A protein has these predicted regions:
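Conserved beta-strand hairpin/beta-sheet module of binuclear metal-dependent hydrolase folds
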Residues: 2-57
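Active-site HxH/HxHxD metal-binding segment of metal-dependent hydrolases
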Residues: 45, 52-150
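Core dinuclear metal-dependent hydrolase active-site scaffold
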Residues: 11, 28, 147-156
Length: 156
């Protein structure tokens, strides 16, 4: 559901099916330059909710700002990057998101869990059922990094 929360600022509720969080809010700032903040999981339902909002708002070009690296906020970024959106994030967030997009991060995490006492039969290689892993971004993205003190000019 798309709601105007302030002049030229809209909130789209994005479903997170079968997840205790149930949903996240994605924001759109409209003006001469448009910005979408966060994307939801890498799931069809999230993508459809965002496509619906973009269509309803009548925008064709927009950038995407990622608030943080959790996959419920950045899962779809490679799809938006491929469609021509500029993807903005802090450098640490962007580097970690790209690191998580491959298998090395998840193998290292599995190994740490085992090292610190989680029985492999109960957890270990089963981290693939965790939604943070299951619905994460799957491809590296060329980020535009933002830093503390940077001013982003969107809306109008």
């Amino acid at each position: 559901m798309l709601t105007e929360v302030a002049k030229n600022i809209y909130k789209q509720v994005v479903p997170l099916p079968n997840n205790p969080l149930r949903e996240i809010n994605v924001y759109f700032i409209l003006g001469e330059k448009n910005l979408m903040i966060d994307t939801g999981f890498n799931r069809r339902e999230c993508e459809e909710a965002l496509k619906s909002a973009v269509s309803e708002l009548g925008i064709e070009e927009y950038d995407v700002f990622i608030s943080h690296l959790h996959s419920d906020h950045c899962g779809l970024i490679s799809k938006f990057a491929k469609s021509g959106c500029k993807i903005l994030a802090g450098e640490t967030e962007g580097e970690m998101i790209n690191f998580e997009s491959g298998n090395l991060y998840w193998r290292m995490l599995d190994d740490l869990f085992i090292k610190f006492g989680f029985p492999e039969a109960q957890f270990g290689r089963n981290t693939d059922i965790h939604p943070g892993r299951k619905y994460c971004n799957t491809e590296k993205v060329n980020f535009t990094y933002v830093d503390e003190g940077d001013v982003l000019e969107y809306g109008g």
